[in-house]
Amino acid sequence: MEEYGDMFGDINLTIGMLSKEDNISKEDIYCHLTSFIQNTDIMDDAIVQRLIYYTSKDMRDEEIPRELRMLAGEVLVSLAAHDFNSVMYEVQSNFRILELPNEFVVLALAELATSYVSQSIPFMMMTLLTMQTMLRLVEDENMRQTFCIALENFSKSIYKYVNHWKDFPYPKLDANRLSDKIFMLFRYIMEKWAPQASPMHALAIIKAHGPTVSLLLHREDFCEFALSQISWLLLQYRDKENDFYITQSLKQILTAAVLYDIALPKNLRRSVLSSLLHQICKVPEPPIKENKLEASSCFLILAHANPVDLLDFFDEQIRSTNEAVRTGILTLLRSTINAEEPKFRNHTTSIEKTVKLVMGDLSVKVRKSTLLLIQTMCEKGYIEAREGWPLIDYIFSQFAMSNRNLENPIKSNSQEDENGEKSVQETSLEVLKSLDPLVIGMPQVLWPRILTYVVPKEYTGTLDYLFNIIRILIMAEEKKKRDIQESTALVVSTGAVKLPSPQQLLARLLVISILASLGQLCGAGAIGLLKIMPEIIHPKLAEMWKTRMPALLQPLEGSNASIVLWETMLLQLLKESLWKISDVAWTSQLSRDFSLQMGSYSNSSMEKKFLWKALGTTLASCQDKDFVSSQINEFLVTPSLLGDHRQGTTSILGFCAENHLDIVLNVLKTFQDKEKFFVNRCKGIFSGKKSLTKTDLILIYGAVALHAPKQQLLARLDQDIMGQILLLYGQCCQILGVSVINKDMDLQMSFTRSITEVGIAVQDAEDQKFQFTYKEMLIGSMLDLIKDEPLNTLASPVRWKVLIAIRYLSKLKPALSLNDHLNILEENIRRLLPLPPLEKLKSQGETDKDRERIEFLYERSMDALGKLLRSMIWDNTDAQNCEEMFNLLRMWLVSQKQWERERAFQVTSKVLTKDVEAPQNFRIGSLLGLLAPHSCDTLPTIRQAATSSTIGLLCAKGICQEVDRLQGLQEGLDSEDEQVQIKISSKIAKIVCKFIPSEEIQVFLEETLDGLETLDPLCTKACGIWMIAALKEHGALLEDQLLEILSTIYHHMPVLRQKEESFQFMLEAISQIASFHMDAVVNNLLQKPLPFDRDTKTLWKALAENPASSGKLMRALIKKLVARLEDDIAGTEAISVACAIYEVILTGAHITHLYPELFTLLLKLVSCSLGQKMPMSTLSQRRRVMQLGERQRFPDPCRLSTATLKCLQAQAMREGLAKESDEGDNLWTLLSNPDTHHIGVCALARSMAVWQHGVILDIMEHLLSSLTSSSENYRITGMAFFSELMKEPILWKHGNLRDVLIFMDQNARDSNAILRQMAIRGLGNTACGAPHKVRKYKQMMLECIIRGLYHLARTEVVCESLKALKKILELLTERDINFYFKEIVLQTRTFFEDEQDDVRLTAISLFEDLATLTGRRWKIFFAEEVKKSMISFLLHLWDPNPKIGAACRDVLVICIPFLGLQELYGLLDHLLERDLPRARDFYRQLCMKLSKKNQEILWILHTHSFTFFTSSWEMIRSAAVKLTDAIILHLTKRYVELLDREQLTMRLQALRQDPCISVQRAAEATLQTLLRRCKEISIPL
C-alpha cells in the first residue's frame, strides 16, 4: 500500500504539471502517462477523472501543437481501459448534432471503436446518427479524411460484431440499423466526396472502401451496390503508393464475398483477375513486395472460390509470349499448389498442360520458374503417370542446356546471361535434390526411364541426386518384395527411351565410384548403387557382391579415405567380378564400353585415370589373347583414342601386364621394331594426331615392370625391360650417332620415373639373391641429372623424381658402402637446401599457376629428400654410420639463413618419425642438444619440426612413455607469443631431459653451449633452458664427467660474455652443477690464478646468487679456509679462498650465522699474510694493457685478505652485526700495514656491535686460540682485538675474559713491544669493563703496567702504560697504590717533555690523578715534585696541542694547594676564558703573585727554564723566554744578583737568532728587562 501511495503521489504531481503552459514538458508527461496507464492494472477514480479532463482539454485546444494534441488523444483513449463510460461520455459530449466537431474528437471515437469493440457497439447508433448530420457541414480536406478514417474503423467494428455477435456479452442488437447508417454515410462519401477527392483524401476513401463494402455484402439489399463499387476501386490502380491499400481493400472484399458465398459477376471477376495479375507482373516498375504478397493472397482466395475459372484465365494469359506474365502465372500456380487448396488437386492435368505450354520458352526467368513449379508439383503429388515424364525430362534437359550454354557461350552473351544460366543450372540441381521419388505416382513415372541419364556425359553433373533417386526406387522395390513375397517389378513401358546395357552401367558406375575417396557425393552414390543392383549388372554377381561390398566400403567410413587404397579395392572388385562372370564376350564388351566412355572425362581427371586402369584390368582378365593383343596394338598405333596418349597407354599396358606380360612385351617389341619414330613424329606434326615416341615407350616399359608378376619379371628384367629402356634412352641422347647430355625435361622425367618403377618392382619381388647389375650405373645417372639442376631456381621436378629413384635403387643389392651413402646424401642435400627462399622461388613464376607448381615441386622435393635420408640412415645397422650421416645435416640446422634452417629441420623431422628404430648404440645426446632448442626458433614450421624431431629421437630409442603429452605441448608452439614458446619449450625440456642417458650429458651440454654462442636470442634462451633442465635432472650423476664439463663451460666463457643472456645461462649451469657437487666446483675454481679475472669473479658471484648453491658455497669455502690456516700460515690457497669469499659476500649473501667463524678466519688470514708477497707461479699469466708510465702492480696477499674482511664487515653492518669504525676507511689501511696492523685490529674490535653479544662471544671463542698461536703476528692480532673487548662490561658478564686477563699479564712481559703494548692496553681497558677485577688483581696489573713505563725505547708502550695507569688509578685508593706511588710519580714526570703529544698529555693527566691519591706519607715528596714540574705545566699552557694546555691548567689547579699558592686560582681562571690571555701578561701576573708569596719558587722556575730555550717547539721556546722575562722582572735584588747573567745573556743572544720571530722578539724583550733590572739595582751585566 505504501508503494501504491507513493506511485499515485507521483501521478498527482505529474497531473499538476499538466496545468502549466509549457508544451515541451507536456510532451514528456504524456509519454510517461501512456506507459504508466498501460502498465497499471488499478487506478484511482479521481485520478482517472482528472486525467480525462486534462487530456480532453489539451486534445481540443487549437493553440497546442498537433503532435501534442495527438498524444493527449492517445492518453484519453488508453484511459478507457480503466473507465470506458467516462471516456465515452467525455468524447460524446464534444460530438454534437449539426455541430462540426474537433478533428481529434472524431479520431478518438474511431480509435475507441476498434480498440474497445464490445463497449463501443452500444454507442455506435448514436455516434453514426450524429456523424450523419455533420457530413454536409464538412468542407475542410483534413476533416473529410478524418471522417473517412472514422468510417473505416466503425465499419471494421460493426463487421466484427455482425460475424461474431455471439461472443459479445449482451443481447443481440439490430445490426441492420447500423449497416443502414454505414450505407448512407458511404453512399454520400462516394457520391459527393470521391469524384473530387485529392490524392490524400482518395487514399483515406480507399482504406475505408474495403471494410465498408465487406460490411455491406452481408445485406442482400446492399449487395449489388457494394459490388458496383469494386469497379471504382480497380480504377484507383494509378498511383504506385496507393496500390497496396487498393489490393488490401480488394482482398477484404474478396474474403467477405467468399464468406457470404457471393459470386462475382463474370466481367467483374475478369477485371479483378486482370488487375491483380497486372500488380504481380508489372514490368517497367517492379511491384512493391507487400502489394505483390497481397495480390497473391487474392489469387488464393479466387482459387478457393472458382479454380476452373482461374486456371482458364491462366491458360489464356500464359499463351502470350510475355516473360513477366508467364513468370508471374507460374509463380502463382506454385504458391497455389503450396497452399494445398483441396479443390485445386482435381485439376492436375490442366496444370500439367499449362506447364507444357512454356517448356519451349528459352527465357531464363521462365525456365527457372517452370523448374520451381515442377519441383512444387513433385513435392505435392501433382504429377500423373501419363503426363508426368516430360516434366521430369525437362529438369534434366534444362541442366544439360545450361551446361552447354556455359561451356560454349555465345560471344554476345553478357555477364547477366551467364549468371542466369548458372541460376537455371543450380535450380535444376535443387529440384533433383528435393525430388521424392516415392511420392504417389512418381515411381511409375521414373522407373526405369530414369536410368537413361546415368551414362550420357551431359548429365554427369546431376549424378549426385540421380543416384540417390535410383537408390531410393530400388530399395523401395526390394522392400515391397520382402513385404508381399512376390515381385512387383517397377518396369513399365519405356516408350521410345533406350535403356543402357549392364556393361555400360557397370563401366559408368565403377569409374564414378573412384570419387568416393574424395568424399564426393556422386562417388558414394555410385558405389551405393553397385551394392544394391548386382542383378541388373549380372545375375552371377549377387552373392559375391553381397559378401564383398561391406569390406569394400570400410575405407570410406573414415574422414580421409586413401585414394590409392580405394582405387586398388575397386580394381580388385572388378577382377573378381569378371572372374565370377567368366564370360569372354561379356568381358570383351565391357572393355569396348570402357573405351567408348573415354570422351566422358577430361584427361586430367581422376575418373579418366581410373578408367585407363580399369580398362587395363579388364583386358588382363580377358582370356581371349587375340582380342587382347589386337586391343593393345590398336592403342599403340592410335593412342589418341585414349585422350592423353602417354598416360592412357602406360596405364592400360601396365595393368594388362599383370596377367599378360608376354603378350605385352611381344606387342611392344613388334611395335618398336616396325615403327619409324622420326617419320611418325613428322606425320603427327602435320596431321595433328599424336603418336607414341621413344620417351613414351620408356615410360611404358617402367609401368609394365611395376605391374608384371614378380617371378616372371626378374627373368625378363635385364634384357627385355632394362635393356630396352637403356637402349631407348641412349638413342634419345644421340645426335648423329654421338652421345650427348639430353636436356629434354620430358625425357629426363620419363627415364627417372621408369627407373623408379623398376626399382620398386625389384624390391617388391623380395628375392634376396637377386643382384641388380645396373644399380651403380643408374645411381650415377641419377646423380648426374640432379647435378645439372641450377641452384637458383626450382622450375623442374627432376630433383624430386631423382630422389625417389635413388631411394628405391639404394635398397637393392648389392649394398652400398658408407662413403657411397655419404656422397649420395651430401650431393642431394647440397642441391636442395641452399635454394633461395620459397617466396623468391615462387616469384620466378609468371602466373599463379606457375607459382603453385613451384610450391608443389618444393614440397615434394623436400619430402623426397627426407624419405631418402630416412631410408639410408635407418637401413644401416651401425650406430656410428647413422651418426655420420646425421652429421651431414648439422651445418644446415644451424644455418644463419632462416629458410635453409627451416628446410633442414623439415627434412630432419621426416627422418625422425615415430615409427623408426635406431641401432642399439645410437647416441641421442648430441642430436637432442642440437635440435631441441629450436623449439623456440623464429618460424612456427621450424619450431614444430624441431619438436617433432625431438620426439622422434626418443621414439627411435624406444622411449615412448610421454609421447602423447609431448605432442599435446607441441601444438602450442604455433603461437607467435615468445613467452608462450619459452614456457612450452621449458615444459618439453623437463620431460625429455629425464630420458637423456647420463653418459651423454656432456655432449648434450657441448651442443647447447655452442647454441648459446651462435643461435638467435630466443633459441639461445631455449638452449639455456634445456641445459639447466638437463643439469637439474642428471646433476647428481655427473661426478665422473665434472672436470670435462667445467672445462667445456670455461672454454665458452670468453665468447658467451659478449652475449648477456647466454652468459647468464652459463652461470646458472655452473650454479646448478655446484648444487650437486659443491666441493668439486669450489676446488676447480680455486685453482684459477690470482688475482681472479673477471670471468672467475663472475662465476663466484653466480654461485653465490643461486639460492640452491649459496648456502653450500659459503660453508664449503669456510671449510677450505679452516684447512688452509690450520698451521697459522697463510698460503696461496688460503688467499684464493679469501678472494672467493670476497666475491660471494659482494653479492649481498647473508652471513649472520656464519659471521663469527668467517670473521675470525679472515682476521687470522690478514694477520698471517702480513708482509707476504704473492708467489709468481700463482699469478695470472694474462697480459694487461698498461698506461704510459704505469708500473705493473702485483697483488698483495694481505691486501686481498683485508679487502675480503672489509667486504664482510660492510655486509655485517648491513645486517646489524657491526657498526662503522671510528677510523673509517683508514681502518683497512692500518690493518694491512704490518706497522699499524695492531691499531687497525683495535679499531676493528671497536666496530663490533656489543649489543650482539652472542655474536661477539662466538668470535671470542674462535679467536681465543690466537693468544697461544705460534705465529707472532696472529698473537698480536688476537691480543689487540681482546684488548679492546676488555672494556665491554657485557662481555665480562657473559664471556670468560679472566683467562684472557692472564694471557695479557704474560704478554705484558713479552719481548715484542707491540704485543706488550696491546697487553697493557687490555689491562687498562679492564678498568672499564670489569672494575672489580682491577681491584682484585691490582698488584699484578700495577706491576705489569709500571714495568711498561721503563720501556723507553718504545714510546707507544710507555704511552699505553700511562693510559692504563690512569684508568686503573681511577678505581684505586691511596692505600692501594701506596707502595708504588713514588715510583709512578717519578716515572710520570719523565714524560712531561716527551715529543709525542699523546705521551705528554697522558703523563700530565696522570700526574693530576696522582695528586688526588697523594697520601699523608707522600705529601711533602709530592710537593717537591710539583715544584720541579711547575715549569713544565706553566710553559705547556701554550703547548701546540690545545688539549695539553687545558691539562696543564687542570693540573696546576690541583697542585697549587701543595705549594700553598691558593692566590693563583683567580689568575688560572683567566685561562678558562674564551680569549686566552697573552703569555707575557699571564707570566708577569703569575710571577708578581709568586714574588709576593714565595721567591723560592720563582728562583726554581728560573733555574729550570734554561732547558726549555732549546725546545723543539717554537711556542715553548717563546713561552720560556717570556717566563724568564717575568721572573727577572719580579725577582728580588738578592736573587737578581745570584743570576748567572753571562750565561743568561749568551742564551738570550742566541735566541735572538731563532727562526721564529716571536722567539726573537721575546728574547730581545727579556734582554732589555735584564739590562733594566741590572741598572735598577746597579749590578753590572
UniProtKB/Swiss-Prot annotation:
Quaternary assembly: Found in a complex at least composed of MROH2B isoform 2, PRKACA isoform 2 and TCP11. Interacts with PRKACA isoform 2. Interacts with TCP11.
Stored SUPFAM superfamilies: ARM repeat
GO term, biological process aspect, one: protein kinase A signaling
Keyword field contains Transferase: no
Disruption phenotype: Embryonically lethal before 10 dpc.
Placement of HEAT repeats on the sequence: 123-160, 305-342, 401-441, 464-501, 526-543, 544-580, 658-695, 773-815, 960-997, 1017-1055, 1112-1150, 1153-1191, 1254-1291, 1295-1332, 1359-1379, 1380-1416
Protein name, UniProt field: Maestro heat-like repeat-containing protein family member 2B
Gene3D superfamilies for the chain: Leucine-rich Repeat Variant
Annotated Pfam families: HEAT_Maestro, HEAT_Maestro_2, HEAT_MROH2B_1st, HEAT_MROH2B_C
GO CC terms: acrosomal vesicle; cytoplasm; sperm flagellum; sperm midpiece
Tissues in which the protein is found: Expressed strongly in round spermatids and fully mature spermatozoa. Expressed weakly in pachytene spermatocytes (at protein level). Isoform 2 is specifically expressed in the testis. Isoform 2 is expressed in pachytene spermatocytes and round spermatids. Isoform 3 is weakly expressed in testis.
Keywords noted in UniProt: Cell projection, Cilium, Cytoplasm, Cytoplasmic vesicle, Differentiation, Flagellum, Repeat, Spermatogenesis
